[in-house]
Structure formats: C-alpha cells, structure tokens
Amino acid sequence: MTSWVGRSAVEIAAAVRERRATPREVVAEHLDRIARLDGRVGAFRRVRAEAALAEADELAARGDLAELPLAGVPLAVKDNLDVRGESKRNGSAATPDTPAAADHVAVARLRAAGAVVIGLTNVPELCVFGTTDGVHGITRNPWDLTRTAGGSSGGSAAAVAAGMAPIALGNDGMGSLRIPAANCGLLTLKPGYGVLPAGIGGGDWFGMSENGPLATTVADARLMCALLAGSERRWPSRVPPTGMRKVAVSLRSPLLGVTVAAPFRAAVREAAGVLIKAGHQVRRADPPYPASLATTSLTHWTAAVAVDAEGLDPRLLDRRTRTQAAIGRRFLKGVRASTARDTLRRRLEPFFAEHDVLLTPALARRSPAAEPWHERSWLRNAAVNSACSPLSPPWNLTGWPAVSVPFGVLPSGAPCAVQLAGLPGSEQELLDVAAEFERLRPWRRTAPLD
C-alpha cells in the first residue's frame, strides 16, 4: 500500500484528483501518525479526528474533486486562527472556550481548495514568544526532541516536520513563522504587508503580522500563497527567473550586542558559494540597520501584546505574558504615533536599490531546551528571544517579505537555515532563489521519528 506520509501537498492532491488515493485514506494515515507520535512532539492542541474523516468523505463525493488544487490534503492550523466549530485558545487559559461561527478567511480559502483541517496546533500564550510551551504543553523539535520547536508557530512547524501534516498555516509577527521553520527544517515565507489576508489579533500587531505557509517544498509554499491570495490578486505574478541576481550577504546581527554563532555563519557562507556557482553576483554587504532597531522592536513587540491582552483576565495569564502586556501599555501611545518604521524603510531602501536579495542567517543560535519557559520571568524569555532570533524583526517592522530556507545541518544533527529578504513585491523572486537551493542542495523533508 502506498504511504502518503512525507509526500508533498502537490503530490497528494494530484493522487486524489487522479483517484489514485481517496481523501479518507490520506487523512486517516496522517491521523494515525499523530496518534502514534504527537505524545512525544506536542504539536497539536486539538486533533479533529472524527470531523476530519467526515469532511474527507464529503470531499470525495464532490463533483469538482478533480479540479481542486489541494484535494484531500491534510492541513494543520495555528491556534490563533478561527476554524468553524472549534474554539480558538491562542495558547491561553484566559481566552474564551467558544466555538468559532466561521472560518478565518485564510482557512476558508485553503478549505475551498480541497484541504482538510486535521487539527489546531500549539502556540505560546498570545503567540508572544520564540518557544512553544504553556497550558497546552511543550512543543518539541521533531529533529531534536530535547529542544523547542521555536515559536510562535511552533506547533504548526512541528506537525509538518514530523510528517503529521504535509502543510500548515501559521503567521509571523516577529519571526513566528521563520523561527520554527528554521528550527524544524521547513520552507516558509513571511509575505510583505497586504499581500495575503491577515486578520490576526488586535490590528495585526500594528500591521507587522502576516499569515503564511509552512511546507517541505517550495512548490507547496508557492501554491498555498497563491490560494491564500484568492481573487484579490495581490500575490505577485510569477515572472521567469532573470538569471543573475545581485545578492548581498550579511553575517551581522541587526541587534547590537547579539552575535551569530559559528555554524549559522558557516551555513550562510556555504549558501553564498552555491549562488556564486549558479551564476549570481554575490558580495558581502551589511544593511545599514540603525542602532535604535532594538528599541523599536521592543516597543512594538510589547505594545502589540498589550492590545491582544485587553479584556483578558490577567489572573489567568502566564507571568511572562502579564509582564509583557504591562510593559507594552507604557509604550502603546508612543507606538501608535511612531514614525520609526517609516524611517527604517527609508534607511534600507537605498541598500536594496543596489541588491535584489539579502542573504543572512535565519537564526543566531540553536533553539533553547524544550522546557517550561512560560514559568520563567519575562526578562529571561526576552533575552532568549533576542539571542536566538535577532534577524527576524527588521522585516516585520518594514513590512517587507522574507523567506526561511533549510540549508545544511547543525553539529547536533538538527537542520540549519538561511534567510532571504527583499523589497515589497519580491515574494516570487525570493521563492525562486529558495527553489535554486532546493534543487542544488536538497534538504531532508521529514524527521526520522519512527
């Protein structure tokens, strides 16, 4: 019997459309894998076993099955997005346990394309931190179960890396897609502002947070983005690759005082070598990050959480979340009036006038141990976030696209990754470069948990 675990969404959908597999067969096999492995990984907060099988049967009876781009593909959804009939807990005991009346638009579009939602994935409380743990347990990296999967889309990333779902939906407010993708060996895109529908929390974290895909292949990520864009046609049209691109390579952390560990610098150097051999014009060049970037990141990050915590019982929040919200309330008025993000864009635009793509490390060091970080102080959590993922915030603050691409392996055996960033509208170009890495340096797609 053919196994569909570890196959891409494109492969699965083609098999279902061609009647080589049924939606029930595909969904049931992934549910079985969840039942066997998720006790070790902790990817899911809620598994929709009966509902998913029923929806798979309904899908099989549709007359347009042969036309659906994601026919029968199991989909994991981050637990801060509405799924009809399911409660959205956002990693917290303080949020209402009330079933959603309708799907979030991003979920609805993927379902309309034939995807079957198999479960809601774990997040840190209010999707704040770079480790996924809290009232719903600890989410571990399937490649190294002693380490966190990262956050805040940690459950979604762990589900895909463990082969429990071929694709997942997550979002990124300060690296929340790219951090867990880099830890778990996945491909992800944080799109630019307004490219894909957001609608995440209170004001999308001042427009910094975007929905996006977690996938094992560039083709799956590209397909998800095209479907998420829907009829709004904001997804950039794909143009044929133009051949040589001007690629800037930077090993520098944007945050002063934070250094990038040697294995992550080495991965970028090796990735640059791959691009040189592929015919691109590659040179070392550091973006002119301002010294104030750390302050801008901190004020916007904490203020966004203050907005999301409004109306929630503080007694039910984790200590680190309460502290973050309290700090953010002090900055809220200033952030709403701030022009710091416009200043950052103006500062970086001349750099990208000279370069098509920026290549950097995706992370500065390996992910922290899989431990109850939610029981520790806010300061300790913030310090770990800054130390591990200083290269994510600039692209949320600017609202520009960034991609995390698996590249190489760390000394521990866990995946390593690089980051690609560009100007607004460069999403397809960044994915084209990611596809070159995929072709020239293919990565392992599923963690060997069996």
Model-derived regions: residue spans:
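Short helix-loop capping/hinge segments that flank enzyme active sites or metal/cofactor-binding pockets
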Residues: 70-90, 244-250, 299-349, 361-365, ...
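Acyltransferase
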Residues: 23-28, 57, 262-286, 309-314, ...
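Glycine-rich, small-residue loops and helix-cap segments
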Residues: 19, 30, 72, 112, ...
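Acidic/His- and Gly-rich active-site-bordering loop/insert found
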Residues: 52-54, 62-135
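Short glycine/serine-rich loop segments
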Residues: 102-225, 397, 401-409, 414-417
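Immediate post-signal peptide segment of exported/extracytoplasmic ligand-binding proteins
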Residues: 59-74, 220, 240-248
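A short helix-breaking turn/cap at a secondary-structure junction
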Residues: 190-266, 270, 289, 441-450
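An N-terminal boundary/leader segment
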Residues: 1-54, 273-280, 349, 446-450
